[in-house]
Amino acid sequence: VDRTGYKAGALDSAMDAVEGEFIAIFDADFEPEADFLQRTMPYFEDEKIGVVQTRWGHTNKQYSILTELQAFGLNGHFAVEQGGRTASGHFINFNGTGGIWRKKCIEDAGGWEHDTLTEDLDLSYRAQLKGWKFKYCEHVVAPAELPITMSALKSQQHRWMKGGAECFRKMAWRILTFKGVKASDKIHGLSHLFNSSVFVFIL
């Protein structure tokens, strides 16, 4: 099995086999509702929309204090961060799963690249610098499982933290020097990419 690029490599390899205009992405532990497409696809009537991201649900929230705390944090991320970003027009990101991409948007932004651990964050910024818009849907929920052990949670957070730092290093200069982006949006975007450093204190 060719594991080059891991998830990003798999997504990149699958692009040639995609015949449709849109790509729904779910991790293995996600259980989208039957009407997921009916509730999300209408947003793509706006041809400038490249991504529709939905809110994550938590099928095992009540498992332990650890899962309840994770659910609380993730709910805050989606309601406050993602909701605020989409409302204000700041940079926003696809969360890696529970959403739909327009294939043309992926291709226009340069495709899935393998040089960061958070390929979703990387592609999100490249797409928005190309002029694509993202839509966050708070009212559409994609249920999934939360890590149930501290070791699994630490591994997940380490990937997110390292990937965020890699994206900051990769994209910071490009964002700073990009014409057509307001100074306030640049500051917000750089802060967004750099904020993964707070997980050092969590872990």
What is each residue range found by the language model?
Residues 115, 124-142, 200:
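Catalytic donor-sugar/metal-binding loop of nucleotide-sugar-dependent glycosyltransferases
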